[in-house]
């Protein structure tokens, strides 16, 4: 799938603004432990780039990764471990990630046609 320059710039701008907003939000509302625990659902491409940006913020911990491709899942887990020193828990079923009570935020990095269902489950779980 090719992308026009306009779409690329729009996507890059939206990603940057989302990271900026999350950076401010994370710094103003940290949990009682002063840590924000995140999980990533969909570990390729933009989702992992978003997670990498989040992990550069102080007080952010990646607790879980989820992807249907176990090769991608293990590759990304190794990268997170290299960045943070801690290996996240791994899942192939996003519902198990959302069911965890220790997760503060979920990054949904699935392909476009798969964003909706994990987002609805995450919103329902609070």
Please annotate each region the language model reported.
Residues 1-125:
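N-terminal glycine-/serine-/threonine-rich beta1-alpha1-beta2 phosphate-ribose binding loop
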